[in-house]
Every structure is written in structure tokens, then in C-alpha cells.
Amino acid sequence: MKLLQIKFSIFILFFSYFTVNAQIQALFNNKTQLRNLTERWELDTTSVRGTFLVTPYKPMYVLPVRWSNNPNEQPHSGNIDPDYIAPPGVDYNNIEAKFQLSFKTKVLQGVFWGRGDLWVAYTQISHWQIYNNNLSRPFREVNYEPELILNIPVNFKIFGFKARMVGVAFNHESNGKSDPFSRSWNRVIFHAGFERNNWTVYIRPWLRMPAAKDDNPDISEYVGRGDLNIIYAKNGNIFSFIGSHNLNFSSKARGNSSFSWSYPIKNNLKGYLLVSHGYGETLIDYNNLQTTVGVGVSLIEWL
């Protein structure tokens, strides 16, 4: 019976994947398969496609199997208010499914003396306890991340890399839960993008905005105050490393590092490997140290 339930869960995942993949391929057609920063962010006159066209933002993937060495069964917050005292722990499986959706659209172009573009973006990451029949297969955590992004093209060289863009974003991220499991934060994120041959680099320092009711006052000490994304693409393979750090270089240095590999299998089917270690894989896990490994399929990559 248990084996049948597992097979049914896997069937649901792959049925969902092929359904979503067909919709995404129709939405992001060949005209939106963007292979560099200039095309993805419309940084010159030859790449401009106008406003309100939905295009990829961050990677989209489905991981039927995502393993954690330290499932967060009783989340706790740095907020000492009694409302944030969690009840006894939940028996979560250390294997679950994970998937990410992410897209953006340009709403204004040619702002700031004709050079800047204003974008709206949305990313959603879901963690699904699909193999946990005892808990009726709940979604353990869903993070919602809308952004308003101002992007400005630039053209100069630094350390052999070509700077392609700079900008700033207003970012909100929350998990939509009530106390004691509510987690959220608002950030002003500065960014810069660089390219050199097969390499692409994003640098993103950020400032956290204060909140009257703070679900997680110490989140920056765990998740970090900025991140670095290094991407290498060759022969259909795309490798990405993302590292975040709290910029505290004492014994309380914390952050997260993740490595992903998207590799071609056949036609549009691409495998996806995602490995991470540190804090903040999700908002509810912002202060939970864990190592995770996920295997699945890629829908959209960084490039």
C-alpha cells in the first residue's frame, strides 16, 4: 500500500511537470529564450521588445526529490513575543518535493533620462511534503516574492569583465502564514551584472527595511546582507553558484551557499541538480542550519 502511495505521488509530480512545462514553453516561446544579460534585460536597442511581455527571471524547476539532513520540525523565531512560541514539533519527512516559478515583465521603458527600465517580477518557491501520507501531504512552506526593479544599462570593464547593468529593487518576501509561523521581510536590493565569455556574475547587496511588527528580527544575521551569483554556460550545461553572507566575519559568520547544474537530456528535457548548505533555504528555515540535495528537471535556466 505504501509503495502504491509513493508511485501515485511521483505520478502526480510528473503529470504536473509536463503540464506546466507545456504551458511555460508556450508562454516563453523561442523569442524569449534569452541567452545573455543584454537579451534577458533588453539592454540595447536591438533587444528591446516593448512592455508587458512576460519573460523569464530566475530559474524554474521541479524537484520530485529534495533531501534535508536536518528537517525543521519545530520552527522558532528570533522574536521573543509569546505569539511566536511554536507548538510541539511536526513529524516532517526529510524527503519532499520542491519547485520554483519565476517571471518578470517590463512596465515602463526609457525612464530616468531615457536609459532605465522599470520591471515587475514574481518568484514563488514551494516545498511539498508529497510523500508524507501521515500528514495528508501538506505544503510545508511556500514563499512569495514580488519585486519592483529599476534596471539601467551600463558599459565599462572591470577585472576583465564587461559591466552590463546596474539597478535597484524593492523586494518583499513572505510565507503567508499566521503566528507563530509568519515570516517576512522587505529589502532594498542593489544589483550589478557582469559578463565575460561563458561567465555571468550578479552582485546583490541589500538593506533590510524596518517593520513595525517584525516576524524575524534577526533574519539578516542568518540569511545574509548580500549575495553573489556566478553562472557558467557551455554546451547546453549551465552551472550556477550562489553564496550569501551576513558580513559578520567573527565566529558568528553565517549565510548560505548553493550549487546548481542544468544539463540537457533530450530535446527540451533538462535535468537539474541543486545542492545547498547553510541558513535560509526558505523563510521558515531562516535560522535552521541544513544541507539539502535535490534532483529533478529544469524548465527555465538563468541563461
Located regions from the model:
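Long, repeat-rich segments with strong aromatic
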Residues: 227-228, 232-242, 246-274, 279-282, ...
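Bacterial Sec-dependent N-terminal signal peptides
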Residues: 1-25
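Outer-membrane beta-barrel initiation region
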Residues: 23-132, 143-146
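Short proline/glycine-enriched turn/loop segments at secondary-structure junctions
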Residues: 4, 283-287
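Outer-membrane beta-barrel "beta-signal"
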Residues: 273, 290-303
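Intrinsically disordered, low-complexity linker/tail regions enriched in polar/charged residues
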Residues: 24, 32, 174, 209-211, ...
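Outer-membrane pore/translocation modules
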Residues: 73-86, 93, 108-232, 243-245, ...
